[in-house]
Amino acid sequence: MFTQANLFLVLLLVIALIAKNNSLILAVSVLIGIKLIGLDQKIFPVLQSKGINWGVTVITIAVLVPIATGDIGFKQLGEAVKSSYAWIALGAGILVALIAKNGIVLLENDPHITTALVFGTILAVSLFKGVAVGPLIGAGIAYLAMQAVKFFSG
C-alpha cells in the first residue's frame, strides 16, 4: 500500500491542504479514491489518454454558457469587435491555441518533459494559487523556447 505513487499523492494532498487549493485537493482525493477501490488499472489509462480533451471540453462548455443563456448574443459580439481589447483577446486566443498545438506534440513525444511540466503545474497550483489549465500551454511555450535555443545555438 505504501508505494512511491501513494506517498507522492499523499504529499500532494498535504501541500494542497496547506495551500487551501480546492481543485488540487479534489483531484488528488479522486485519484487516491480510485486507487483505494482498486479501479486504478482500468480508469487511470483512460484518464491519462482522454482527460486533457475532456477538461478542454468542460472549459469550453463553461465559456459557452453565457451564449446558451442569452447573456451574450450578436449585439454583444458586434459591440466587442469595436473594442481594441476584444481584438487583443481574439489575437491572444489564436496565439494560445497555436502554441498549445505544439505542446501536444511535445507531451506525446518527450515523457521526461511531461514530468517536468506536470511538476511545474503542481507547484504553481499548490503554492501560487495557479490554475491547472497550463500543461498544454506550458508544453507549447517550452516547445517554442526549445526551438529558439536550437535556432540560436546551432
From Swiss-Prot:
Record-linked InterPro entries: UPF0756_TM
Q: Name one Pfam family in it.
A: DUF441
Disulphide bonds in the chain: none
Where does the signal peptide begin and end?
none
Q: Where in the cell is it found?
A: Cell membrane
The answer to whether UniProt assigns keyword Membrane to this entry is yes
Q: How does it sit in the membrane?
A: Multi-pass membrane protein
Gene Ontology CC, one term:
plasma membrane
Keywords on record: Cell membrane, Membrane, Transmembrane, Transmembrane helix
Q: Where are the transmembrane segments?
A: 8-28, 54-74, 87-107, 117-137
What does the similarity note say?
A: Belongs to the UPF0756 family.
Which PANTHER family does the record match to this protein?
Answer: UPF0756 MEMBRANE PROTEIN YEAL
Q: What is this protein called?
A: UPF0756 membrane protein BPUM_2558
- Organism, scientific name: Bacillus pumilus (strain SAFR-032)
